[in-house]
């Protein structure tokens, strides 16, 4: 059963993708359990996604085995409205993941180091003149 699509304006999509990182396709298989993802289908339909339940996941779809990502809308499997669904990698054009605290710390440290490096380059350039 396919979930009915909710249409989001480009502005709403942009807002929902704040703090999410576009993941290159060759790294999709490394997105771990519990990570929240959002994605665009190959038909360019924006989906708000869910939490990774299994990834990669070998799904049989129309008698064909496909590599997929299995998602859920919550961690409480007994909660009313809890659903899981499978999305084959081939049906995804763009996949975004919400980084955890470790990744945010790494990103912040890299940005600080890059800023310091840029300052050093500017200082050296000024001395050369």
UniProtKB/Swiss-Prot annotation:
Domain of life: Viruses
EC number: 3.1.4.-
Positions of transmembrane segments: none
Keyword Hydrolase assigned: yes
Keyword Hydrolase among record annotations: yes
Any one Gene Ontology cellular component term annotated for this protein: virion component
Keyword terms: Host-virus interaction, Hydrolase, Inhibition of host innate immune response by virus, Inhibition of host interferon signaling pathway by virus, Interferon antiviral system evasion, Viral immunoevasion, Virion
Top EC class for this record: hydrolase
Compartment annotation: Virion
Gene Ontology biological process terms, A to Z: symbiont-mediated suppression of host innate immune response; symbiont-mediated suppression of host type I interferon-mediated signaling pathway
An example Gene Ontology molecular-function term: hydrolase activity
Protein family: Belongs to the asfivirus C129R family.
Function as written in the Swiss-Prot or TrEMBL entry: Plays a role in the inhibition of type I interferon signaling pathway. Mechanistically, specifically interacts with 2',3'-cGAMP and cleaves it via its phosphodiesterase activity. In turn, prevents 2',3'-cGAMP interaction with host ER-resident STING1 leading to inhibition of downstream signaling pathway and type I interferon production.
Record's protein name: Uncharacterized protein C129R
Species this protein is from: African swine fever virus (isolate Pig/Kenya/KEN-50/1950)
């Amino acid at each position: 059963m396919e979930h009915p699509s909710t249409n989001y304006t480009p502005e709403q999509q942009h807002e929902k993708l704040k703090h999410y990182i576009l993941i290159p396709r060759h790294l999709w298989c490394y997105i771990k359990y519990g990570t929240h993802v959002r994605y665009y289908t190959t038909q360019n339909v924006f989906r708000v996604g869910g939490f990774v339940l299994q990834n990669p996941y070998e799904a049989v779809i129309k008698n064909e085995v496909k590599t997929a990502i299995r998602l859920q809308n919550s961690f409480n499997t007994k909660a009313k409205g809890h659903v899981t669904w499978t999305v084959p990698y081939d049906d995804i054009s763009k996949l975004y993941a919400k980084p955890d605290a470790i990744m945010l710390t790494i990103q912040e440290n890299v940005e600080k180091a890059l800023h310091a490096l840029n300052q050093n380059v500017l200082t050296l350039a000024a001395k050369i003149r």
